[in-house]
């Protein structure tokens, strides 16, 4: 079997201030609870998208600047997933199931399909 090369960390340093990572994690949690809960509005979703853009930049700095830890990887994946949820919710101009949008209280037949998003 081929040998897997050792992971090169480059100039990454061990996280010296874990509080920054935990604060970002808490901000993500609060953003999703406050702006992307079951009852939504376009205004709240746009606010969430803005906050997630900032978090994405911070997490990118953590990802490339620190030695990777499970917390950094999980935070990166959670921010990516949260961004997809917000983007999808902004595209769907309807209320369906347990997700109610005050701006669009009715179902729309054109959204009676899966929403597929890709981000790289």
Task: Outline where the language-model segments fall.
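Glycine- and aromatic-enriched mobile tails/lids
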Residues: 1-120
């Amino acid at each position: 079997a081929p040998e897997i090369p050792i992971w090169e960390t480059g100039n990454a340093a061990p996280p010296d201030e874990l509080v920054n990572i935990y604060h970002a994690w808490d901000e993500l949690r609060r953003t999703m609870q406050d702006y992307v809960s079951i009852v939504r509005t376009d205004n709240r979703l746009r606010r969430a998208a803005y906050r997630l853009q900032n978090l994405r930049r911070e997490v990118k700095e953590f990802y490339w600047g620190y030695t990777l830890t499970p917390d950094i990887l999980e935070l990166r994946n959670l921010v990516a997933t949260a961004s997809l949820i917000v983007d999808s919710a902004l595209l769907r101009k309807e209320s369906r199931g347990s997700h109610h949008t005050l701006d669009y209280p009715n179902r729309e037949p054109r959204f009676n399909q899966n929403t597929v998003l890709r981000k790289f």
